[in-house]
Regions:
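Active-site-adjacent loop and "lid" segments of alpha/beta metabolic enzymes
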Residues: 5-21, 40-58, 62, 67, ...
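Catalytic domains of carbohydrate-active enzymes, especially glycoside hydrolases
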Residues: 20-36
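Phosphate/pyrophosphate-binding loops at sites that engage ATP/ADP/AMP, CoA/4′-phosphopantetheine
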Residues: 26-31, 141-154
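Conserved functional loop/turn residues at catalytic and ligand-binding sites
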Residues: 29, 34, 88, 149, ...
Length: 248
């Protein structure tokens, strides 16, 4: 529901288009619909809490009214998250992992009982031992959640592909995402159409489906079971095929 998304900004920023797109994604296999009112791409434009609420709440309400589907709200702002929960969202996707955004977000999650996708992110790209540092920094986010009263059953972790990582680091964290799974929480992998795919294949954002599917299958093989994608049908079918092979 914003116009400056790196991939599909502006395509679904009215209610009718959002509902039609939701219907299509559910038909294609989606189990969670992610709603966002402010882009988190590099160089994104900040908007006020009130504007963000005005963008996301009507969409959440309409989706919950018209479809039997879980809704995730992509926001790091507590006031927006609170409005989203009241509107019916089931999960908060905090791109700052309770650490660098608004620190009372974990309190809200604990109080309301919604799920929380806790993403790895940081202000400066500095690491001593990259993969272990990401794992340990996600542990810190989990500790913040626990101190606020968030239960383990509410927590999903996200390695944060494309956030506070260079090209090689993005490849490494996809390769070693199983290390994050060792923390004992479900892991969401979000690679869809991201620059690591564009740089690898030398393709623009509109031609990254094949690369996205490859990362989805790789993540599935390593144990991920939640994937944030734009092209639902293609990724869902690839997952189903890969899962059959893995279980054969």
């Amino acid at each position: 529901m914003y116009t400056d998304s790196f991939s599909d900004g502006g395509k679904f920023n009215n209610l009718d288009a959002a509902l039609k797109h939701t219907e299509e994604m559910i038909k294609d296999g989606a189990k969670i619909i992610d709603v966002g009112g402010e882009s988190t791409r590099p160089g994104y434009t900040l908007i006020s809490d009130e504007e963000e609420i005005g963008r996301v709440v009507p969409v959440i309400e309409a989706i919950k009214k018209n479809f039997d589907i879980a809704v995730s709200l992509d926001t790091y702002k507590t006031k927006v998250a609170e409005a989203g929960v009241k509107a019916g969202c089931d999960m908060i996707n905090d791109v700052w992992g309770f650490k660098y955004g608004e620190r009372d977000m974990a309190d809200l999650v604990a109080k309301t009982g919604v799920a929380a996708c806790v993403m790895h992110n940081k202000n400066v790209i500095t690491y001593n031992d990259f993969v272990n540092d990401v794992v340990n920094e996600l542990k810190e986010s989990v500790e913040i959640a626990h101190k606020a009263g968030v239960k383990d059953s509410q927590i999903v972790l996200d390695p944060g592909v494309g956030f506070a990582k260079d090209y090689e680091q993005n490849l490494l964290i996809i390769k070693h995402v199983d290390k994050i799974l060792e923390l004992g929480y479900p892991v969401l992998l979000g690679t869809s159409r991201k620059s690591v795919i564009g740089l690898t294949l030398d393709v623009d954002k509109n031609d990254r489906m094949a690369g996205t599917v490859a990362t989805t299958v790789m993540g599935l093989e390593r144990g991920c079971r939640i994937f944030r994608v734009h092209d639902v049908k293609e990724n869902y079918q690839a997952m189903m095929m890969a899962e059959k092979i893995l279980k054969a």
